C-alpha cells in the first residue's frame, strides 16, 4: 500500500509535526509499505502532493491538521486517512466547544470563560472561577502561549500573548491534582499514564524535551480506574471519536476532570501514546499498523 505521511503544516506546532512524521516514516517502513513523505508548507500542497496515494497518515498538529480542514480535503479527494473525521476534529480543536459538550453530558471539567479581546475580559467571572487560572489559546496545542496566572494583575498580559496565536482565549480554573492521560485505541482504553512535569505544569518544554517530565504507567485504585475509564469512554462516545484519541485529565481528591481531547496525538519518541501502547506489549510499528487498519475500516 502506498502511504503518504502528511507532516509539517502551517501551525505553531510544525516542528512537533515534523518530528512525529519522521518517527512514523521510520517505523511504517518496517512494515513493507511504500512510504511517501509529504511535507506541507501551505494549504494548497495537500491537493497536489497527496495525488496517487492509497492512504494518508496524518502526522499534523494544530491548525489545518487537527481542526478538520485536511480531513475534509482528503475526503473530497476520496483518500482514506488516519484518525477522527472532520466534525470531531474541529470540535475537539475548539476547547470551548469541547467543554460545552462535556458539561452538557455531565462529564467533569474545570470551570472556564472565553474572551476574544482584552476589552471584554470579565474579571468578575474570573474571580468566580477562582485563581490561579490557566490562560491559553482556545484552539492551540502543545501548551504554546499557555500561562498559569495567580492573580488579576497577570491576566491582561497573558491574554494579550494568547491572542497573538488565536482569535479566542480560554481562561480556565487551575485544578491542582495528578495529571493523567488516557490513550483510546478503537474505543478501548490503553494503560493510564501519570504525567509528572519537572516544571510547574506540563508546558511545551516538559512535553517535548528529553527529561522535561516523567510519564509513567500507573495502576489506579479500582474505583478510580473505573471512573476514569467510564469518563474516557463517555468522551469517546459524546464527541463521536474514531480510531484513536488521547483524553487528558486531572485527578483531584479522587475525582477525575477532563482537560481536553487530542485527536492527533504526538508520535515522537517522547510521545505518550506509544508509551501507553508499549505497556501492553504493542510495539510502535504495531501501533501504527493498527491505526492504519482501524482507519481503513471507518466509513467516511
Curated annotation (Swiss-Prot):
GO terms for cellular component: cytoplasm. Binds 2 magnesium or manganese ions per subunit. Mg(2+) 2 binds at residues 260, 262. It catalyses: 2 D-alanine + ATP = D-alanyl-D-alanine + ADP + phosphate + H(+). ATP binds at residues 126-181. Residues 99-293 form the ATP-grasp domain. Keywords: ATP-binding, Cell shape, Cell wall biogenesis/degradation, Cytoplasm, Ligase, Magnesium, Manganese, Metal-binding, Nucleotide-binding, Peptidoglycan synthesis. GO terms for molecular function: ATP binding; D-alanine-D-alanine ligase activity; metal ion binding. InterPro entries: ATP-grasp (IPR011761), ATP_grasp_subdomain_1 (IPR013815), D-Ala_lig_Van_CS (IPR000291), D_ala_D_ala (IPR005905), Dala_Dala_lig_C (IPR011095), Dala_Dala_lig_N (IPR011127), PreATP-grasp_dom_sf (IPR016185). Pathway: Cell wall biogenesis; peptidoglycan biosynthesis. Its EC number is 6.3.2.4. It is an enzyme of class 6 (ligase). Mg(2+) 1 binds at residues 248, 260. Its cofactor is Mg(2+); Mn(2+). GO terms for biological process: cell wall organization; peptidoglycan biosynthetic process; regulation of cell shape. It holds the Pfam family Dala_Dala_lig_N. It is found in: Cytoplasm. Belongs to the D-alanine--D-alanine ligase family. HAMAP family: Dala_Dala_lig. Cell wall formation. This is D-alanine--D-alanine ligase. It comes from Clostridium botulinum (strain Langeland / NCTC 10281 / Type F).
Amino acid at each position: 500500500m502506498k502511504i503518504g505521511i502528511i507532516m509539517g503544516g502551517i501551525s505553531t506546532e510544525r516542528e512537533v509535526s515534523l518530528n512525529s512524521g519522521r518517527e512514523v516514516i521510520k517505523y511504517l517502513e518496517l512494515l513493507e509499505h511504500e512510504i511517501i513523505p509529504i511535507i506541507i508548507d501551505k494549504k494548497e500542497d495537500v491537493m497536489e502532493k497527496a495525488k496517487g496515494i492509497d492512504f494518508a497518515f496524518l502526522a499534523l498538529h494544530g491548525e489545518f491538521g487537527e481542526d478538520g480542514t485536511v480531513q475534509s480535503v482528503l475526503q473530497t479527494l476520496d483518500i482514506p486517512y488516519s484518525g477522527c473525521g472532520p466534525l470531531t476534529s474541529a470540535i475537539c480543536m475548539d476547547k470551548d466547544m469541547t467543554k460545552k459538550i462535556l458539561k452538557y453530558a455531565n462529564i467533569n471539567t474545570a470551570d472556564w470563560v472565553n474572551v476574544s479581546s482584552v476589552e471584554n475580559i470579565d474579571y468578575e467571572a474570573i474571580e468566580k472561577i477562582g485563581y490561579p487560572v490557566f490562560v491559553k489559546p482556545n484552539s492551540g496545542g502543545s501548551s504554546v502561549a499557555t500561562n498559569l496566572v495567580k492573580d488579576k494583575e497577570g491576566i491582561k498580559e497573558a491574554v494579550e500573548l494568547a491572542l497573538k496565536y488565536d482569535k479566542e482565549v480560554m481562561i480556565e480554573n487551575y485544578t491542582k491534582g495528578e495529571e493523567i492521560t488516557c490513550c483510546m485505541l478503537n474505543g478501548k482504553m490503553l494503560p493510564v499514564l501519570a504525567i509528572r512535569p519537572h516544571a510547574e505544569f506540563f508546558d511545551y518544554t516538559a512535553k517535548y524535551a528529553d527529561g522535561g517530565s516523567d510519564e509513567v504507567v500507573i495502576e489506579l485504585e479500582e474505583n478510580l480506574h473505573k471512573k476514569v475509564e467510564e469518563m474516557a469512554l463517555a468522551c469517546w462516545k459524546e464527541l463521536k471519536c474514531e480510531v484513536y484519541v488521547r483524553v487528558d485529565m486531572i485527578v483531584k481528591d479522587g475525582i477525575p476532570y477532563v482537560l481536553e481531547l487530542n485527536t492527533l496525538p504526538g508520535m515522537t519518541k517522547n510521545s505518550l501514546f506509544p508509551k501507553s501502547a508499549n505497556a501492553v506489549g504493542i510495539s510502535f510499528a504495531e501501533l501504527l499498523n493498527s491505526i492504519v487498519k482501524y482507519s481503513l475500516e471507518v466509513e467516511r
